[in-house]
A protein has these predicted regions:
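C-terminal catalytic "cap/lid" subdomain
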Residues: 1-263
Length: 263
């Protein structure tokens, strides 16, 4: 079993929450991969540098200056803080982006409906064998959501997408090696809520399970909206491509939350 866990930047910017989560992660037995965000920290750094952050429908517009900032924050500050902390907890962590080892390639998102997100990447190729080799050698990859293009551009990429594509690549790599147990990979999205909520202000309104049919209705009713949509889209993409199980949960409860189901 390989566990791929994505942790949101909102947790990482809180020292106590980050420490508690990383201790849980460190306690997980067996091979594991951590994918992290850091959007809020990037916004804070941009403010310090006098750079305005532009968002469209909750998504960051990444111009050249912003790309430099997110690369420094995600691939540098946040990534190395997490790696260093995991090392003190007995985890032989190694920090990386999609450019390291050339394991996650993307294309610059084209302008669509007049919207240009700038240096934002859509993943087109993942080499799961590279990550598997690290895991087989006792290393724990800690992945920042920066990918690269065929012409050498660094690209800001949605961390949920990076996590989903990582899990899919791991599942495919295991199947190629003869493991038919449906990839034997688990994917967990962790953030500040207990899971997907029918009322975002009521923690007791947890939706325990989401199927494609119920997801369609939840979107139509406006219960699921904004940034939760790409998160759930990525969850379903993982399930559809052979990842064994996917859940969305609070960072302090890796076994709780909302389970994403095929049917």
């Amino acid at each position: 079993m390989i566990q791929v866990i994505k942790i949101g930047g909102g947790v990482l910017e809180n020292e106590a929450q980050r420490d508690a989560f990383l201790r849980q992660f460190a306690a997980i037995e067996g091979p594991k991969v951590l994918v992290h965000g850091g959007g809020r920290l990037a916004t804070t750094m941009a403010e310090r540098l006098g750079v305005e952050t532009q968002m469209i429908d909750g998504r960051r517009v990444t111009d050249k200056v912003t790309l430099d900032i997110v690369t420094m924050v995600y691939g540098g500050l946040v990534n190395k803080q997490v790696v260093a902390q995991l090392q003190t907890m007995g985890v032989n962590a190694i920090g990386m982006t999609g450019a390291d080892g050339g394991w996650m390639k993307a294309v610059k998102r084209p302008i669509k409906n007049g919207i240009d997100y700038g240096y934002v990447g859509d993943v087109i190729e993942v080499n799961g064998a590279h990550l598997r080799a690290l895991l087989d050698n006792g290393l724990t990859p800690v992945i920042a959501p920066i990918t690269f293009s065929a012409d050498g551009l660094l690209l800001n990429t949605n961390a949920d997408t990076v996590a989903s594509q990582t899990a899919i690549a791991m599942a495919e790599a295991m199947r190629r090696e003869g493991d038919e147990a449906r990839g034997n990979v688990q994917l967990t999205f962790c953030f500040e809520k207990v899971g997907v909520l029918s009322n975002p202000d009521d923690e007791s309104s947890l939706i325990a399970r989401i199927t494609p049919e119920s997801y369609t209705q939840l979107k139509a009713d406006g219960i699921v909206s904004g940034g939760m949509i790409p998160k759930i889209d990525n969850a379903f993409a993982a399930i559809e491509h052979g990842v064994q199980s996917v859940r969305i949960t609070h960072a302090n409860n890796l076994q709780g939350g909302t389970i994403i189901e095929e049917r």
